[in-house]
């Protein structure tokens, strides 16, 4: 499955329209290129409808948001819905401030989101519970996050993916636990945002958004493991360079052989 989707991604080179934050925009563009897709960053409300019509996936990331930008995201999201373009929402910092929480919930209410990807605190907040967050980072993982994510997936009718020590992905029917990854990935800012770009890249070509999201998490985690094993890596700076190289050099064979996942099918 993963081999097929990665090959398809690199053959088709899907266009990924980002409305994302100013902190990580360059990294998101570069990781999209590295995995094999094409990034475009278009924010102007006057052009987002036209741009998203030509895209194969849309990323909505509220990391550095304003009310005006949220309005633009919703405008783009509704157009994506009309044209069958998957919408990937990264509710960065939901739970940290009322603006972020209300904005994320508003997007979910007004746009048919395909995938919600966040940390445990963000996903808990969107489910109506209280997540422990500091700034935009979860400071403590929820013990029952798989149940919380499952319930949110059922409620919203979409895939919910939670990044953490063990990643959790569910569509309300199946739950996958991904154990690929490395602690070094948490030493650089933007890995979560970059993961969202990779999720969008896979979902742009996958027939099923659960499968696309799962393969993206596996690919991202394997790249992190391999980068951390590079003898030239001495800290966050060299790790980041090695990580981009590993994303670029991922092969279908490695993706198939080095995955660490547990899959549960709900009754």
From Swiss-Prot:
The gene is thiM. InterPro entries: Hyethyz_kinase, Ribokinase-like. Substrate binds at residues 41, 190. Its EC number is 2.7.1.50. Pathway: Cofactor biosynthesis; thiamine diphosphate biosynthesis; 4-methyl-5-(2-phosphoethyl)-thiazole from 5-(2-hydroxyethyl)-4-methylthiazole: step 1/1. It holds the Pfam family HK. ATP binds at residues 117, 163. It comes from Caldanaerobacter subterraneus subsp. tengcongensis (strain DSM 15242 / JCM 11007 / NBRC 100824 / MB4) (Thermoanaerobacter tengcongensis). Belongs to the Thz kinase family. SUPFAM superfamilies: Ribokinase-like (SSF53613). This is Hydroxyethylthiazole kinase. It catalyses: 5-(2-hydroxyethyl)-4-methylthiazole + ATP = 4-methyl-5-(2-phosphooxyethyl)-thiazole + ADP + H(+). Catalyzes the phosphorylation of the hydroxyl group of 4-methyl-5-beta-hydroxyethylthiazole (THZ). Keywords: ATP-binding, Kinase, Magnesium, Metal-binding, Nucleotide-binding, Thiamine biosynthesis, Transferase. Its cofactor is Mg(2+). GO terms for molecular function: ATP binding; hydroxyethylthiazole kinase activity; magnesium ion binding. One of its GO terms (biological process) is thiamine diphosphate biosynthetic process.
């Amino acid at each position: 499955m993963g081999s097929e989707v990665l090959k398809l991604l690199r053959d088709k080179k899907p266009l990924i329209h980002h409305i994302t934050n100013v902190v990580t925009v360059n990294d998101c563009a570069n990781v999209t290129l590295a995995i094999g897709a094409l990034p475009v960053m278009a924010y102007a409300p006057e052009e987002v409808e036209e741009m998203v019509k030509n895209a194969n996936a849309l990323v909505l990331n509220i990391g550095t948001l304003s009310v005006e930008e949220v309005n633009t995201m919703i405008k783009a999201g509704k157009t994506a819905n009309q044209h069958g373009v998957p919408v990937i929402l990264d509710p960065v910092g939901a739970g940290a401030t009322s603006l972020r929480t209300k904005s994320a919930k508003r997007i979910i209410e007004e746009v048919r989101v395909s995938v919600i990807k966040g940390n445990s605190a963000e996903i808990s907040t969107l489910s109506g519970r209280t997540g422990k967050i500091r700034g935009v980072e979860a400071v403590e993982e929820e013990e029952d996050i798989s149940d919380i994510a499952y319930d949110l997936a059922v409620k919203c009718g979409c895939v919910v993916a939670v990044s953490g020590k063990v990643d959790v992905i569910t569509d309300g029917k199946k739950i996958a636990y991904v154990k690929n990854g490395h602690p070094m990935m948490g030493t650089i800012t933007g890995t979560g945002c970059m993961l969202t770009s990779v999720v969008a890249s896979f979902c742009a070509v996958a027939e099923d958004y659960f499968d696309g999201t799962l393969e993206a998490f596996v690919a991202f985690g394997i790249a992190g493991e391999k980068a951390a094993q590079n003898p030239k890596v001495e800290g966050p700076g060299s790790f980041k360079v090695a990580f981009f190289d590993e994303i670029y050099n991922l092969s279908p064979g490695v993706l198939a052989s080095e995955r660490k996942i547990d899959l549960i099918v709900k009754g």
